[in-house]
Amino acid sequence: MMKSSKVSTILLLLFVVIIGSFCLTYGAPSTTNQKPLTSSEKKLLNDLYDRAKKAGGVVEFKSNLDSKKFVTAQNRPYDLLALFTSSNPKYGCSGCVQLKNQIESFSLSYEPYLNSAGFLEKPIFIVILEVDYNMEVFQTIGLNTIPHLLFIPSGSKPITQKGYAYTGFEQTSSQSISDFIYSHSKIRIEPVKTFYEKYSVQILSFVVFLASVRFLITAYRKRKSPMFWYFLTILLFACVIMGIFYDFIHKPNFYEFDHRQQTYNYFSRGSRSQTVSEGMIMGVSTIAITLIFVFLSDILPNYTNFSSKSKGLLFFMGMSSIIVLLFFQSLAFQIKYYRPLFFIPSVTYHY
Protein backbone atom coordinates (compact mmCIF):
# COMPACT_ATOMS: atom_id res chain seq x y z
CA MET A 1 0.00 0.00 0.00
CA MET A 2 2.83 2.37 0.95
CA LYS A 3 4.68 1.46 -2.22
CA SER A 4 1.73 2.29 -4.49
CA SER A 5 1.25 5.60 -2.66
CA LYS A 6 4.90 6.56 -3.26
CA VAL A 7 4.61 5.63 -6.93
CA SER A 8 1.49 7.80 -7.27
CA THR A 9 3.25 10.72 -5.59
CA ILE A 10 6.29 10.39 -7.86
CA LEU A 11 4.08 10.24 -10.96
CA LEU A 12 2.14 13.30 -9.80
CA LEU A 13 5.35 15.28 -9.20
CA LEU A 14 6.68 14.22 -12.59
CA PHE A 15 3.45 15.35 -14.24
CA VAL A 16 3.63 18.73 -12.47
CA VAL A 17 7.27 19.19 -13.58
CA ILE A 18 6.40 18.40 -17.22
CA ILE A 19 3.43 20.78 -17.24
CA GLY A 20 5.49 23.51 -15.56
CA SER A 21 8.32 23.14 -18.06
CA PHE A 22 5.85 23.30 -20.95
CA CYS A 23 4.24 26.46 -19.58
CA LEU A 24 7.60 28.14 -19.05
CA THR A 25 8.68 27.27 -22.57
CA TYR A 26 5.50 27.99 -24.56
CA GLY A 27 3.17 29.78 -22.20
CA ALA A 28 4.30 33.35 -22.90
CA PRO A 29 5.52 34.88 -26.13
CA SER A 30 9.24 35.33 -26.28
CA THR A 31 10.48 38.89 -26.53
CA THR A 32 14.10 38.03 -27.05
CA ASN A 33 13.66 38.03 -30.83
CA GLN A 34 12.36 41.59 -30.88
CA LYS A 35 15.12 43.77 -32.21
CA PRO A 36 15.61 46.90 -30.09
CA LEU A 37 15.23 50.22 -31.87
CA THR A 38 18.30 52.18 -32.81
CA SER A 39 18.66 55.80 -31.76
CA SER A 40 17.73 57.03 -35.26
CA GLU A 41 14.63 54.80 -35.33
CA LYS A 42 13.56 56.04 -31.89
CA LYS A 43 13.99 59.63 -33.04
CA LEU A 44 11.96 58.95 -36.20
CA LEU A 45 9.18 57.33 -34.16
CA ASN A 46 9.11 60.09 -31.56
CA ASP A 47 9.11 62.85 -34.19
CA LEU A 48 6.11 61.39 -36.00
CA TYR A 49 4.40 60.61 -32.70
CA ASP A 50 4.74 64.25 -31.60
CA ARG A 51 3.38 65.48 -34.92
CA ALA A 52 0.40 63.14 -34.68
CA LYS A 53 -0.36 64.32 -31.15
CA LYS A 54 -0.22 67.98 -32.21
CA ALA A 55 -2.37 67.33 -35.29
CA GLY A 56 -5.00 65.48 -33.28
CA GLY A 57 -4.47 62.13 -34.97
CA VAL A 58 -4.11 62.51 -38.75
CA VAL A 59 -0.86 63.99 -40.09
CA GLU A 60 -0.89 65.75 -43.45
CA PHE A 61 2.47 66.02 -45.18
CA LYS A 62 3.00 69.27 -47.07
CA SER A 63 6.40 68.59 -48.62
CA ASN A 64 8.47 65.89 -50.27
CA LEU A 65 11.00 66.18 -47.45
CA ASP A 66 8.44 65.10 -44.86
CA SER A 67 7.11 62.24 -46.94
CA LYS A 68 10.63 60.99 -47.70
CA LYS A 69 11.57 61.22 -44.05
CA PHE A 70 8.58 59.35 -42.65
CA VAL A 71 6.99 57.35 -45.49
CA THR A 72 9.81 56.07 -47.67
CA ALA A 73 12.34 55.95 -44.84
CA GLN A 74 14.49 52.88 -44.28
CA ASN A 75 13.67 50.66 -41.28
CA ARG A 76 10.39 52.35 -40.41
CA PRO A 77 9.61 51.42 -36.78
CA TYR A 78 5.87 51.93 -37.28
CA ASP A 79 2.99 51.01 -39.57
CA LEU A 80 1.27 53.62 -41.73
CA LEU A 81 -2.21 54.06 -43.13
CA ALA A 82 -1.53 56.47 -45.99
CA LEU A 83 -4.13 58.27 -48.08
CA PHE A 84 -2.79 59.44 -51.44
CA THR A 85 -5.15 62.10 -52.73
CA SER A 86 -5.51 65.68 -53.96
CA SER A 87 -7.61 68.69 -53.02
CA ASN A 88 -6.74 70.33 -56.34
CA PRO A 89 -9.72 70.20 -58.75
CA LYS A 90 -7.22 69.57 -61.54
CA TYR A 91 -6.42 66.13 -60.10
CA GLY A 92 -9.04 65.44 -57.49
CA CYS A 93 -12.62 64.27 -57.66
CA SER A 94 -15.62 63.78 -55.42
CA GLY A 95 -14.22 60.41 -54.34
CA CYS A 96 -11.06 62.10 -53.08
CA VAL A 97 -13.02 64.58 -50.99
CA GLN A 98 -15.33 61.90 -49.62
CA LEU A 99 -12.51 59.55 -48.64
CA LYS A 100 -10.46 62.35 -47.08
CA ASN A 101 -13.46 63.43 -45.01
CA GLN A 102 -13.97 59.82 -43.93
CA ILE A 103 -10.33 59.52 -42.84
CA GLU A 104 -10.56 62.76 -40.86
CA SER A 105 -13.77 61.49 -39.27
CA PHE A 106 -12.03 58.21 -38.40
CA SER A 107 -9.44 60.21 -36.45
CA LEU A 108 -12.04 60.51 -33.66
CA SER A 109 -11.81 56.75 -33.26
CA TYR A 110 -8.04 56.65 -33.78
CA GLU A 111 -7.13 59.37 -31.26
CA PRO A 112 -7.90 57.26 -28.12
CA TYR A 113 -5.50 54.58 -29.40
CA LEU A 114 -2.89 57.25 -30.16
CA ASN A 115 -3.11 58.48 -26.56
CA SER A 116 -3.16 55.00 -25.02
CA ALA A 117 -0.28 53.67 -22.93
CA GLY A 118 0.44 50.77 -25.29
CA PHE A 119 0.59 52.80 -28.49
CA LEU A 120 4.40 52.84 -28.77
CA GLU A 121 4.47 49.04 -28.48
CA LYS A 122 2.44 48.69 -31.72
CA PRO A 123 2.53 52.14 -33.35
CA ILE A 124 0.46 52.96 -36.40
CA PHE A 125 0.04 56.44 -37.88
CA ILE A 126 -2.55 57.83 -40.28
CA VAL A 127 -1.09 60.21 -42.87
CA ILE A 128 -2.42 62.14 -45.87
CA LEU A 129 -0.22 62.87 -48.88
CA GLU A 130 -1.37 65.48 -51.39
CA VAL A 131 -0.14 64.96 -54.94
CA ASP A 132 0.77 68.66 -55.31
CA TYR A 133 3.25 68.45 -52.44
CA ASN A 134 4.42 64.83 -52.69
CA MET A 135 4.77 64.13 -56.40
CA GLU A 136 8.08 62.30 -55.95
CA VAL A 137 6.51 59.78 -53.57
CA PHE A 138 3.65 59.19 -56.01
CA GLN A 139 6.17 58.49 -58.77
CA THR A 140 8.27 56.25 -56.52
CA ILE A 141 5.28 54.06 -55.64
CA GLY A 142 3.91 54.16 -59.18
CA LEU A 143 0.53 55.75 -58.47
CA ASN A 144 -1.11 57.11 -61.62
CA THR A 145 -4.63 57.62 -60.26
CA ILE A 146 -6.22 58.90 -57.08
CA PRO A 147 -7.44 58.31 -54.48
CA HIS A 148 -5.46 55.42 -52.99
CA LEU A 149 -5.53 54.22 -49.40
CA LEU A 150 -2.54 52.00 -48.65
CA PHE A 151 -1.36 50.13 -45.61
CA ILE A 152 2.42 50.50 -45.34
CA PRO A 153 3.97 47.97 -42.94
CA SER A 154 6.98 48.71 -40.79
CA GLY A 155 10.44 47.83 -42.06
CA SER A 156 12.29 48.58 -45.27
CA LYS A 157 10.25 46.68 -47.84
CA PRO A 158 9.29 48.69 -50.95
CA ILE A 159 5.83 50.24 -50.73
CA THR A 160 3.43 48.32 -52.95
CA GLN A 161 -0.24 48.42 -53.85
CA LYS A 162 -0.52 44.66 -54.29
CA GLY A 163 -2.21 43.20 -51.24
CA TYR A 164 -2.07 46.47 -49.28
CA ALA A 165 -4.61 48.66 -51.09
CA TYR A 166 -8.03 49.49 -49.70
CA THR A 167 -10.72 48.59 -52.24
CA GLY A 168 -14.02 49.43 -50.55
CA PHE A 169 -14.38 53.02 -51.80
CA GLU A 170 -18.05 52.59 -52.65
CA GLN A 171 -19.03 51.79 -49.07
CA THR A 172 -16.32 53.45 -47.00
CA SER A 173 -17.07 53.79 -43.30
CA SER A 174 -15.17 54.00 -40.03
CA GLN A 175 -15.89 50.32 -39.48
CA SER A 176 -14.51 49.26 -42.87
CA ILE A 177 -11.34 51.32 -42.31
CA SER A 178 -10.96 49.76 -38.85
CA ASP A 179 -11.35 46.28 -40.36
CA PHE A 180 -8.79 47.13 -43.06
CA ILE A 181 -6.24 48.16 -40.41
CA TYR A 182 -6.93 45.04 -38.34
CA SER A 183 -6.54 42.72 -41.33
CA HIS A 184 -2.96 43.91 -41.86
CA SER A 185 -1.71 44.85 -38.40
CA LYS A 186 -4.00 43.00 -35.92
CA ILE A 187 -4.53 46.38 -34.25
CA ARG A 188 -8.17 46.79 -33.32
CA ILE A 189 -9.39 50.39 -33.30
CA GLU A 190 -13.02 50.50 -32.27
CA PRO A 191 -14.85 53.16 -34.30
CA VAL A 192 -16.78 55.86 -32.48
CA LYS A 193 -20.40 55.56 -33.59
CA THR A 194 -23.21 58.08 -33.60
CA PHE A 195 -26.61 57.35 -32.09
CA TYR A 196 -28.02 56.42 -35.50
CA GLU A 197 -25.07 54.13 -36.32
CA LYS A 198 -25.49 52.30 -33.02
CA TYR A 199 -29.23 51.81 -33.23
CA SER A 200 -29.96 52.01 -36.96
CA VAL A 201 -30.69 48.28 -37.21
CA GLN A 202 -33.19 48.43 -34.35
CA ILE A 203 -34.83 51.57 -35.77
CA LEU A 204 -35.04 50.05 -39.25
CA SER A 205 -36.44 46.79 -37.85
CA PHE A 206 -39.15 48.71 -36.00
CA VAL A 207 -40.07 50.69 -39.12
CA VAL A 208 -40.20 47.50 -41.20
CA PHE A 209 -42.38 45.86 -38.55
CA LEU A 210 -44.87 48.77 -38.60
CA ALA A 211 -44.87 48.78 -42.41
CA SER A 212 -45.48 45.02 -42.46
CA VAL A 213 -48.43 45.34 -40.08
CA ARG A 214 -49.84 48.15 -42.19
CA PHE A 215 -49.39 46.10 -45.35
CA LEU A 216 -51.17 43.08 -43.86
CA ILE A 217 -54.11 45.26 -42.82
CA THR A 218 -54.28 46.81 -46.30
CA ALA A 219 -53.97 43.41 -47.99
CA TYR A 220 -56.85 42.06 -45.90
CA ARG A 221 -59.08 45.04 -46.72
CA LYS A 222 -58.20 44.94 -50.44
CA ARG A 223 -58.19 41.15 -50.75
CA LYS A 224 -61.09 41.23 -53.24
CA SER A 225 -59.62 44.00 -55.41
CA PRO A 226 -57.96 42.68 -58.60
CA MET A 227 -56.05 45.94 -59.10
CA PHE A 228 -54.40 45.57 -55.70
CA TRP A 229 -52.99 42.21 -56.71
CA TYR A 230 -51.91 43.63 -60.07
CA PHE A 231 -50.03 46.37 -58.26
CA LEU A 232 -48.50 43.87 -55.83
CA THR A 233 -47.30 41.64 -58.67
CA ILE A 234 -45.74 44.58 -60.50
CA LEU A 235 -44.02 45.70 -57.30
CA LEU A 236 -42.64 42.21 -56.77
CA PHE A 237 -41.32 42.00 -60.34
CA ALA A 238 -39.77 45.45 -60.04
CA CYS A 239 -37.99 44.56 -56.78
CA VAL A 240 -36.61 41.35 -58.26
CA ILE A 241 -35.36 43.03 -61.42
CA MET A 242 -33.84 45.96 -59.54
CA GLY A 243 -32.17 43.54 -57.15
CA ILE A 244 -30.69 41.54 -60.02
CA PHE A 245 -29.21 44.62 -61.65
CA TYR A 246 -27.94 46.06 -58.38
CA ASP A 247 -26.26 42.76 -57.52
CA PHE A 248 -24.87 42.44 -61.04
CA ILE A 249 -23.32 45.92 -60.93
CA HIS A 250 -21.99 46.05 -57.39
CA LYS A 251 -20.88 42.57 -56.32
CA PRO A 252 -18.88 40.45 -56.38
CA ASN A 253 -15.67 41.96 -57.80
CA PHE A 254 -15.47 39.83 -60.91
CA TYR A 255 -12.50 39.34 -63.16
CA GLU A 256 -12.84 39.27 -66.92
CA PHE A 257 -10.56 37.08 -69.02
CA ASP A 258 -8.71 38.63 -71.94
CA HIS A 259 -8.23 35.79 -74.45
CA ARG A 260 -5.64 37.72 -76.46
CA GLN A 261 -3.48 38.68 -73.51
CA GLN A 262 -4.34 35.53 -71.53
CA THR A 263 -4.83 37.66 -68.42
CA TYR A 264 -7.56 38.39 -65.90
CA ASN A 265 -8.58 42.01 -65.37
CA TYR A 266 -10.86 43.73 -62.92
CA PHE A 267 -14.21 44.89 -64.16
CA SER A 268 -13.96 48.66 -64.15
CA ARG A 269 -15.23 50.48 -61.05
CA GLY A 270 -14.96 54.01 -62.45
CA SER A 271 -17.18 56.03 -60.17
CA ARG A 272 -18.32 58.63 -62.72
CA SER A 273 -19.18 56.32 -65.63
CA GLN A 274 -20.72 53.78 -63.29
CA THR A 275 -22.92 56.40 -61.62
CA VAL A 276 -24.19 57.71 -64.96
CA SER A 277 -24.97 54.28 -66.39
CA GLU A 278 -26.45 52.90 -63.21
CA GLY A 279 -28.58 56.01 -62.76
CA MET A 280 -29.96 55.75 -66.30
CA ILE A 281 -30.70 52.05 -65.90
CA MET A 282 -32.51 52.47 -62.61
CA GLY A 283 -34.19 55.72 -63.61
CA VAL A 284 -35.56 54.58 -66.97
CA SER A 285 -36.71 51.23 -65.60
CA THR A 286 -38.45 52.95 -62.68
CA ILE A 287 -40.25 55.34 -65.03
CA ALA A 288 -41.35 52.44 -67.25
CA ILE A 289 -42.68 50.48 -64.28
CA THR A 290 -44.49 53.58 -62.97
CA LEU A 291 -46.18 54.26 -66.32
CA ILE A 292 -47.35 50.67 -66.63
CA PHE A 293 -48.62 50.74 -63.06
CA VAL A 294 -50.58 53.96 -63.73
CA PHE A 295 -52.07 52.40 -66.85
CA LEU A 296 -53.10 49.22 -65.05
CA SER A 297 -54.37 50.86 -61.87
CA ASP A 298 -56.12 53.96 -63.22
CA ILE A 299 -56.76 53.96 -66.96
CA LEU A 300 -57.48 50.28 -67.49
CA PRO A 301 -60.37 49.95 -64.96
CA ASN A 302 -62.25 52.79 -66.72
CA TYR A 303 -62.61 50.67 -69.84
CA THR A 304 -65.48 48.40 -68.89
CA ASN A 305 -65.38 46.53 -72.19
CA PHE A 306 -61.96 45.06 -71.25
CA SER A 307 -62.35 41.50 -70.04
CA SER A 308 -60.24 40.02 -67.25
CA LYS A 309 -58.44 37.94 -69.88
CA SER A 310 -57.51 41.09 -71.80
CA LYS A 311 -56.30 42.74 -68.60
CA GLY A 312 -54.12 39.75 -67.80
CA LEU A 313 -52.71 39.75 -71.33
CA LEU A 314 -51.92 43.46 -71.13
CA PHE A 315 -50.26 42.94 -67.76
CA PHE A 316 -47.91 40.23 -69.00
CA MET A 317 -47.18 42.22 -72.15
CA GLY A 318 -46.26 45.16 -69.93
CA MET A 319 -43.96 43.09 -67.75
CA SER A 320 -42.35 41.49 -70.80
CA SER A 321 -41.70 44.94 -72.25
CA ILE A 322 -40.00 45.97 -68.99
CA ILE A 323 -37.69 42.94 -69.09
CA VAL A 324 -36.86 43.56 -72.77
CA LEU A 325 -36.26 47.24 -72.02
CA LEU A 326 -33.81 46.43 -69.23
CA PHE A 327 -32.02 43.92 -71.44
CA PHE A 328 -31.53 46.44 -74.24
CA GLN A 329 -30.37 49.02 -71.72
CA SER A 330 -27.69 46.60 -70.61
CA LEU A 331 -26.63 46.30 -74.26
CA ALA A 332 -26.54 50.07 -74.62
CA PHE A 333 -24.34 50.63 -71.58
CA GLN A 334 -21.56 48.15 -72.25
CA ILE A 335 -18.88 49.81 -70.23
CA LYS A 336 -16.11 47.60 -68.89
CA TYR A 337 -18.11 46.14 -66.04
CA TYR A 338 -20.79 45.00 -68.52
CA ARG A 339 -18.38 43.39 -70.97
CA PRO A 340 -18.84 40.79 -72.38
CA LEU A 341 -22.63 40.34 -72.46
CA PHE A 342 -23.65 38.93 -69.09
CA PHE A 343 -20.52 36.76 -69.13
CA ILE A 344 -19.50 35.78 -65.63
CA PRO A 345 -16.06 34.12 -65.61
CA SER A 346 -15.80 30.71 -64.02
CA VAL A 347 -12.96 32.04 -61.86
CA THR A 348 -14.24 34.70 -59.47
CA TYR A 349 -12.67 36.30 -56.45
CA HIS A 350 -14.52 37.62 -53.42
CA TYR A 351 -13.03 40.30 -51.18
From Swiss-Prot:
InterPro entries: OligosaccharylTrfase_OST3/OST6 (IPR021149). Residues 49-185 form the Thioredoxin domain. One of its GO terms (molecular function) is dolichyl-diphosphooligosaccharide-protein glycotransferase activity. Belongs to the OST3/OST6 family. Subunit of the oligosaccharyl transferase (OST) complex that catalyzes the initial transfer of a defined glycan (Glc(3)Man(9)GlcNAc(2) in eukaryotes) from the lipid carrier dolichol-pyrophosphate to an asparagine residue within an Asn-X-Ser/Thr consensus motif in nascent polypeptide chains, the first step in protein N-glycosylation. N-glycosylation occurs cotranslationally and the complex associates with the Sec61 complex at the channel-forming translocon complex that mediates protein translocation across the endoplasmic reticulum (ER). All subunits are required for a maximal enzyme activity. One of its GO terms (cellular component) is oligosaccharyltransferase complex. Residues 1-27 form the signal peptide. The chain crosses the membrane at residues 199-219, 226-246, 280-300, 313-333. Pfam families: OST3_OST6 (PF04756). It comes from Dictyostelium discoideum. This is Probable dolichyl-diphosphooligosaccharide--protein glycosyltransferase subunit 3. Gene3D superfamilies: Glutaredoxin (3.40.30.10). It is found in: Endoplasmic reticulum membrane. Disulfide bonds join 93-96. One of its GO terms (biological process) is protein N-linked glycosylation. Component of the oligosaccharyltransferase (OST) complex. Keywords: Disulfide bond, Endoplasmic reticulum, Membrane, Signal, Transmembrane, Transmembrane helix. It is a multi-pass membrane protein.
